[in-house]
Each structure stands twice: as structure tokens, then as C-alpha cells.
Amino acid sequence: MTPDELARLTGYSRQTINKWVRKEGWTTSPKPGVQGGKARLVHVNEQVREYIRNAERPEGQGEAPALSGDAPLEVLLVTLAKEMTPVEQKQFTSLLLREGIIGLLQRLGIRDSK
């Protein structure tokens, strides 16, 4: 994910994400197709997820928006799917094909089993 995409998903600023990338030594790689070497992709692994979960917000900033409420669900789902490994994508696809959206929502506790 780009720092901008990660910022939109978490509610933190792009500058804060970039600061954490440098400070915490998160794994990054050049963004394909962008010249100059400035644009980077952040590899969102368990270390990154854990750090963001435990990050404290400055006073007055409140909670993170619900996964950046301005991000449409479709964009969020596509972004998350791109972050999955090929094996995870295959397993998730199999689950959706096997159980459908109703089965997935029931597993997540979003829909009653009735």
C-alpha cells in the first residue's frame, strides 16, 4: 500500500505514516511505474498492523474514523484484497464461492443465521 492509501484507511496523516516507516524500519519497495525513486509501497505485515493498532493519538484527535469513512466500501475491499498473499486470496475466493456473501456475513457476526 502507498503511505497515502494507508493513511486513508487508518485516519492518520500521510506524513505520520512516512515518519513511522522511517522510524520503525518498515519494509518498503519502489512503486512500479513511478520514476525518481520517491514513491514507495509499504509492505503491510503483522509488525505494521500491530504498531498501528497500538499507536496513541495526540490529545483532541479522537478515534480513527471508521476506516476512513470517505473511502467507498468497494475501494476498501479491493485494497485489502491486494494486500493478501496469493494463497490467502485463493482461500478467500474459495470461501466466498462455497458459502456466498450470506455465509461470510454470518461468520463475521454481521448477519443472523436465520
From Swiss-Prot:
Protein name, per record: Uncharacterized protein YfeC
- InterPro entries tied to this protein: DNA-bd_dom_put_sf, YfeC-like
Protein family: To E.coli YfiI and P.aeruginosa RluD.
This chain's source organism reads Escherichia coli (strain K12)
